[in-house]
């Protein structure tokens, strides 16, 4: 028989940097989960990732206080900031441009994010990436 799911917990944790300090410790602790077990398992699975890459993780919590977790791809804004070589997006996205990304970079980001996006073609994924880029104040060039 399958275990009874009592809840889900969504966190964004830097790759290889999960530790019991806030926000991870309190979030897991108040649900009665083993914090160190999660930290060790997460850090082991994110060894290949670049250090401090934000990794969204969905933790499934079961009635017997056990858990499983699923890692997603880093946020689109992270990839866009890397591609445009900027620290943050524009403060006024409609007026000020923070940087530029090319169509080739947009396609590359769309291919990386494809499994987490709610679309079935690379073209629709590219439109999502372009929309995110525009909302960050990035110009999508040729």
UniProtKB/Swiss-Prot annotation:
GO terms for cellular component: cytosolic large ribosomal subunit. The keyword Iron does not apply. The keyword DNA-binding does not apply. Keywords: Methylation, Ribonucleoprotein, Ribosomal protein, RNA-binding, rRNA-binding. One or more lysine residues are methylated. Signal peptide: none annotated. GO terms for biological process: translation. One of its GO terms (molecular function) is large ribosomal subunit rRNA binding. Pfam families: Ribosomal_L11, Ribosomal_L11_N. HAMAP family: Ribosomal_uL11 (MF_00736). Forms part of the ribosomal stalk which helps the ribosome interact with GTP-bound translation factors. Part of the ribosomal stalk of the 50S ribosomal subunit. Interacts with L10 and the large rRNA to form the base of the stalk. L10 forms an elongated spine to which L12 dimers bind in a sequential fashion forming a multimeric L10(L12)X complex. Belongs to the universal ribosomal protein uL11 family. This is Large ribosomal subunit protein uL11. It comes from Bradyrhizobium sp. (strain ORS 278). The gene is rplK.
